[in-house]
Amino acid sequence: MADNNSPPGSVEQKADQIVEANPLVKDDTSLETIVRRFQDSMSEAKTHKFWETQPVGQFKDIGDTSLPEGPIEPATPLSEVKQEPYNLPSVYEWTTCDMNSDDMCSEVYNLLKNNYVEDDENMFRFNYSKEFLRWALRPPGYYQSWHIGVRAKTSKKLVAFISGVPARIRVRDEVVKMAEINFLCVHKKLRSKRLAPVMIKEVTRRVHLENIWQAAYTAGVILPTPITTCQYWHRSLNPKKLIDVGFSRLGARMTMSRTIKLYKLPDAPITPGFRKMEPRDVPAVTRLLRNYLSQFGVATDFDENDVEHWLLPREDVVDSYLVESPETHDVTDFCSFYTLPSTILGNPNYTTLKAAYSYYNVATQTSFLQLMNDALIVSKQKGFDVFNALDVMHNESFLKELKFGPGDGQLHYYLYNYRLKSALKPAELGLVLL
């Protein structure tokens, strides 16, 4: 279970097309190619010794169709699960983080704000808000014991954090209870202390105590072994600011005024019946989502309680819109995005990059292009600088036409203690982890 994705990278515009800053040949991003490059670049001494001891797909097993799909290790009796926490180095101690407490929430927020994932050039760092963290960490049926901190014994300062939340994820035809592992963060000055492996083992132990034996997680780095590798795409909403802060660059033969004109959007959504989601829409949205997600090889298994928590709009956290037929009043289409700003490091004029991230979208009557263009319009109205999307589900069908450009960030998806016989294409994945 692992560190989350890095902030999406930069995008370069060229003439009236959008091209990536670090071009990748599409055929070169297959899982086998990525793994081969990884293995070629790693000496034997640097291989992932920790992950080789864990029940995860191993690089050496890729292509071995004799291995069964499903759990790698069987569930063990709860009485045999280690009852005491794993030992930390003597100067540290475990703490359980109560996200209902304002003080505790502030501690977690500040740790992440100052030490969480940065882009490769150290220009941007994720800045999850306190409201976002409470939303992400307190879904229906959450376990406070899965919100795990590490303190320095002497100063009592929070120096590391890892979290899990319960989820139901369908893998092929089987719905599996899992933990979604996220927000693994160790203070920058303690990165050499090998805290992460023991934190991963501890959250795994606590998950096992609730009789859950599988997990899902993402990382911006390659570990053994991704079930799929997704590409980040970015759509400029405020191109001047994005260029000024170094997120994107002015393309060859492009002026700033031409670039602004290229990305200009209408002032209001154009789809009749397009409106903000309300509590009364939860049953209809749940039906739409369940039907849509059923076509993907791995997907989240939403019920109404999940939809109410994850998709009802929350200011500066998550936005959801739908199309209600003016004639029948049926809910026919749905789009959503969550708010994840990044701190801009070392820029004298700007401190925050406001980014929207595509979440779950379903189009049945409205064209997907028109639905997502309306999502871009409302995100621009709400002051976002950029709209980000992964090439999961059917997202690839709108990315190029709506002027998204591929970034240099990739996100690898993993399952813990569950083997897939073959890797998925991004378009076969119906799961978005925050």
Curated annotation (Swiss-Prot):
Keywords: Acetylation, Acyltransferase, Cytoplasm, Transferase. Transmembrane segments: none annotated. SUPFAM superfamilies: Acyl-CoA N-acyltransferases (Nat). Tetradecanoyl-CoA binds at residues 48-51, 184-186, 192-196. The keyword Acyltransferase applies. GO terms for cellular component: cytosol; plastid; ribosome. The modification N-acetylalanine is found at residue 2. Optimum pH is 7.8. Active from pH 5.5 to 8.5. GO terms for biological process: embryonic shoot morphogenesis; N-terminal protein myristoylation. It is found in: Cytoplasm. Its EC number is 2.3.1.97. Residues 1-24 are annotated as: Disordered. Expressed ubiquitously, with higher levels in young tissues (at protein level). It catalyses: N-terminal glycyl-[protein] + tetradecanoyl-CoA = N-tetradecanoylglycyl-[protein] + CoA + H(+). One of its GO terms (molecular function) is myristoyltransferase activity. The active site is at residue 434. Adds a myristoyl group to the N-terminal glycine residue of certain cellular proteins. Can also use decanoyl-CoA and lauroyl-CoA as substrates. Belongs to the NMT family. This is Glycylpeptide N-tetradecanoyltransferase 1.
